[in-house]
Amino acid sequence: MKLTCVLIITVLFLTACQLTAAGNSRDKQEDPVVRSSGEVQRSEDIKLAKRCLESGSLCFAGYGHSSCCSGACLDYGGLGVGACR
């Protein structure tokens, strides 16, 4: 009986801690990144910055998005591999 009471109290305590932590952290990112038109506007971390391929670089076409700076990847022969315009 004592063990059951201890387990119930422990579960209630841990649940209360989780709910409190979740409520306090809502809408409070430490370093929010604002993305607009596919580009990172504020990023101190170089890994988060968007990199694009220059004209003439090899790219993968046909995926609905392009990693080319111009936004256009010209597909050669329908293979899905092309070059940035």
UniProtKB/Swiss-Prot annotation:
Q: Which residues form the propeptide?
A: 23-49
**Keyword line:** Cleavage on pair of basic residues, Disulfide bond, Knottin, Neurotoxin, Secreted, Signal, Toxin
- The positions making up the signal sequence are 1-22
- On the tree of life, the source organism's domain of life is Eukaryota
The places in or outside the cell where this protein is found are: Secreted
A GO CC annotation given for this chain: extracellular region
Broad class of where this protein is predominantly found:
secreted
For whether the record's keyword set contains Secreted, the answer is yes
Keyword Secreted assigned: yes
Q: Which GO terms describe its molecular function?
A: ion channel inhibitor activity; toxin activity
Which tissues is this chain's protein expressed in? Answer: Expressed by the venom duct.
Which Cys-Cys disulphide bridges does the record give? 52-69, 59-73, 68-84
Q: Which family does it belong to?
A: Belongs to the conotoxin O1 superfamily.
Q: What does this protein do?
A: Produces no obvious effect on ionic currents when tested on the mouse dorsal rooted ganglia (DRG).
Q: What is known of its domains?
A: The presence of a 'disulfide through disulfide knot' structurally defines this protein as a knottin.
- Please report the name of this protein according to its UniProt entry: Conotoxin MaIr94
- The organism of origin for this protein: Conus marmoreus (Marble cone)
